[in-house]
Design a protein with these regions (language model features):
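Conserved GNAT acetyl-CoA-binding A-motif
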Residues: 119-130
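Helix-turn-helix
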Residues: 137
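Conserved G/P- and acidic residue-centered "switch" motifs that form tight phosphate/ATP-binding loops
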Residues: 106
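Conserved catalytic-core motifs of GNAT/GCN5-like acyltransferases
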Residues: 128-132, 142, 147-164
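Conserved N-terminal entry element of GNAT/NAT acetyltransferase domains
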Residues: 1-15, 172-180
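Acetyl-CoA-dependent GNAT
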Residues: 11-12, 22-32, 38-101, 112-114, ...
Length: 180
């Protein structure tokens, strides 16, 4: 059985995180987001983004990476304070991505579990996540007990897309999913 390790991301991980981000983005959204609207998602601009996040975290943001037994980053999760302040949730998952070959193996759950434990340690009580409505990931969050909160329209490139928020009102309820 291959071993996986979850750890806190450091600055030098930015490029690898960007690789995973762009590669998963393109495979997850190829049928959801217009190619033109996706064209500005490049490894270069994502690397710059993650370097900034890891150097100067805003909103109490932190990033966890998932490494395989060769210490290659194959997935990551990030989050921090809930950004809209509209729904009464204090924490938010900003991103969760895994390379294609590592999906459907329980590794998203591994990241989600590690992240929610970390959020609880940081004093968060609840958790929200926004997912493009047509993204199959909404099933993943539902499987772990998230409830639909709200939907709104977002702009990506020149296109508009619907996003749905899912939430856990109590992080403990999410943590309990992993001890069942």
């Amino acid at each position: 059985v291959p071993m996986f390790n979850v750890r806190k991301a450091v600055y030098k991980d930015a490029r690898k995180i960007a690789d995973v981000h762009v590669s998963s983005w393109k495979s997850v959204y190829k049928d959801v987001i217009d190619e033109q609207d996706m064209s500005n998602i490049t490894v270069e601009n994502r690397t710059a983004l993650w370097e900034t996040v890891l150097k100067v975290p805003l909103n109490g943001q932190f990033v966890l990476v998932l490494e395989n037994d060769r210490e290659e980053i194959v997935g990551f999760i990030s989050g921090g304070r809930e950004r809209t302040k509209r729904y009464g949730y204090d924490g938010e998952i900003y991103t969760l991505y895994l390379l294609d070959d590592y999906q459907k193996k329980g590794l998203g759950g591994l990241l989600l579990h590690a992240f929610s434990k970390e959020m609880k340690v940081h004093g968060y009580d609840s958790l929200l996540v926004w997912v493009l409505t047509k993204n199959p990931a909404s099933k993943f969050y539902r499987k772990y007990g998230a409830k639909r909160v709200e939907a709104e329209i977002v702009t990506i490139g020149d296109g508009t897309y619907q996003e749905t928020a899912f939430g856990w009102q109590h992080i403990d309820a999410l943590l309990n999913q992993f001890h069942a």
